[in-house]
Amino acid sequence: MTDRHILTPAEGISSDGYITDQDCFSSVRYRGMRADINGCGWIAAYNLRHALGQEADWDEVRQEMDAMHTLRFPGPTLMRIMRSYLAKYVPDYRETAGREEAAQAAKESFAGIFRYQEGHEPHFISFVRQPDGRFRFFNVTDGLEDCVMPMSRFQEEHLIRGHVIALTVSEDGADREESSRGTT
């Protein structure tokens, strides 16, 4: 029998404060489940606030979003909860639906969140523009926990099935938030 290393939340956070690996949150509960299974929504919301330079504690974000779900049964973050949470903390965000439209809005943004299907699973991820024009993506999938690529490549490789929604913040909105650009 071999000892299996249990991942901890600290291991899932980058040196510049982004949550990069949802798998490290198996000891944390969200909506009655282990957050490594259904935590992508609150993780994306935390990362977006972090990208905008807002003071946010990941556990407080998780607890607040969990409490916003009035129906107390296990499941993922609902879009209405994500919208309500962002309206409170990121009031200048813009929602765009449709694969091409969402990708274009994201390409023109400073930072944001995608709601899409990764494989066959609904998923939220966050992203932030880098100084060279590419984007840094967080918590995409195993092997792509923290990666930098052009938005067009992300679109070609990940926004390929199902409904896509982009929740984006423009450069102007980011400037008002006293942005920290989160470079690698």
Task: Give the role of each language-model region.
Residues 60-101, 108-109, 116:
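Papain-like cysteine protease catalytic cores
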Residues 6, 10, 23, 75-77, ...:
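Generic low-complexity segments that are intrinsically disordered, proline-rich and/or Lys/Arg-biased
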Residues 1-71:
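Active-site-adjacent structural segments surrounding the nucleophilic cysteine of cysteine proteases
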Residues 47, 118-119, 142-145:
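Solvent-exposed loop/turn segments at secondary-structure junctions
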Residues 12, 23-24, 96, 101-102, ...:
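Intrinsic disorder/low-complexity segments enriched in polar/small residues
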Residues 128-184:
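Noncatalytic regulatory segments and standalone regulatory/sensor domains
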Residues 94-136:
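Active-site-adjacent substructure of cysteine-protease-like catalytic cores
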